[in-house]
Each structure stands twice: as structure tokens, then as C-alpha cells.
Amino acid sequence: MKRQSILFVRSMWVVILFTTLAACKDTDNRVFGDDFEFPALTDENTIRFTVNVVGDWRQLDIVASGGRMVIDWGNGRIQKIEDPSSMSGGVVYRYGNKGLYEVRIWAEELQLIDISGLLLPLSHLYLGNMPRMKSLALNSISDTRELDLNTFCPNVESINIGSFADLEHLEIEDCFRLRSIQVYSNPKLTSIEFGSHPEAESLYCSYNGFSSLSLKSLPALRDIDLSSNEVLSHLELNEKTSISAILIQGCAFQSITDILKCCPSLRELSCSYNKLTELDQI
């Protein structure tokens, strides 16, 4: 009788164990966060980059707003965020182990995202479809030679692209809604093809590798900062532009006569450390 009781108890434990395992199988413990359905994460609908956790700092912060987002942290964990703007300081994730992690972010509903590799090294950035994106900030990312904003975020209004060690090509000519353009500290970026940007009022493009720029397709420009483009010697402006400030110090201009002719409303000019033999008369 006692033996039968022991066998019965063991049988019950086996049943409980299998029931528990079945329940775990039905619940994907890799996925955590808010409760909503999301599409399969593909190259077409995600932002993708590599995180290199090499030191004691293992925390990655991503600021976003405007819609739902899903992040595959690259270690088997997927986080769903209904409202990322409600998270103070952004979405924060801390990696447990050192290593390389391939991160994917579903961002089709987002209107703003800020990704930076300043504290944790990021590389190999690729963009996916972001039709609602209005404000895009990408900083301190290596091993990325080109970015195509035309295809993936054509409705963007503000861009902040900085400190890309290897960026050579940036496509923004079809982003017609651009108002603010900040592209800086990209030493290998030698040219930008500006399309028609009728609403762009500010251009901050310092510390790049430009030798020549044409801004004729930006008629609404008010403020221009092209400082510290060490080989920049030629600049074309729209004659109908009411520019109030131009900063071109630390460039290679030999003359700024043509620039000044296009700026009858100019209030601020900084042109030190160029190759000017004498200051052109205004």
C-alpha cells in the first residue's frame, strides 16, 4: 500500500512537471513588456545595428516617441513598448555579458528616435522603413558608409547625424519636409546632394570633409554653420535667400565676395582661419 502511494505521488509530480513545461512552451519568455501584437522583424521594417559590449559599461539607452516600438536586443530577449515617451530617460537595457549583439528595432510607428554609441560602441547601422519618422538622431556609430533617408524616412523634418567615423554618402535629396539639417563630425563625408528643401531654415554641417557645397535648393535658409570643413573653398547660395548668419571659420575660402552678394540681410559673419588675403567689402 505504501509503495502504491509513493508511485501515485511520483506520477502526480510527473503530470505537474509536464503541465508546467507545456505552459512554459505556450508562453514565450523571450518576449517581455507591454501586451500587443507586432509583425515579424525583418530587414525591411527594422533599424539594425551591432552593439559591442567590451567594458564595464553595459547599458544601452534609446530615446523614442510617437508610437509603439519593439526591440530585439540581440541576446534572445525581445521587448515591447507601447509608449516609449513615457519612459523617463528613454528605453534602458543592461547586458549581462560582454560580446557582440545584433539589435533590431521595429520603428514603423515612431515619430522620433535617438540612437547614440557615445557610451557603448555601436557599428554597422542599417535603416528600415520609417514612414512616420519626423525627428531622427543618430550619433557615434562606426562601420557605416552610407545612409539612405530618401527611401526609409522620406517625411523626416529634423535630422541629427553626427560622429560617424566612416560615413561617406548621405542621401536626403527627396526628404522634402526637412526643416533642420545637422550633419557634423563625419570626417569622410565629402558631399551631400541637397534636393528641394523649401522649408529648411537651419543648416549645421561643421567638421566634415566637404570641399564644395551648393545650397541653391534651400531658399528658406536663415542660419548656416559650415565651420571647420578644412578643405571647403566653394559655396553656392540661393540669391533669394534671406540669410542672417554664416559661420565658415576654419575652411579654405580664398574669397567670399560671391557669398556676400547673396546675403543682403546678413547680420553675423564668421570667416576667420581661411585663406583670405583681405576681407571682401560688403
State each model region's role.
Residues 1-8:
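N-terminal secretory signal peptides that target proteins for export/translocation
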Residues 5, 15, 70, 191, ...:
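Generic short N-terminal amphipathic or hydrophobic helices
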Residues 11-20:
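Bacterial N-terminal signal peptides
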Residues 24-142, 154, 163, 176, ...:
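N-terminal capping/linker segments that flank leucine-rich repeat
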Residues 113, 125, 136, 144-147, ...:
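Canonical leucine-rich repeat
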Residues 115-120, 137-143, 151-153, 160-166, ...:
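Concave beta-strand-loop units of leucine-rich repeat
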Residues 128-131, 150-152, 162, 173, ...:
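C-terminal helix/turn sub-motif of individual leucine-rich repeats
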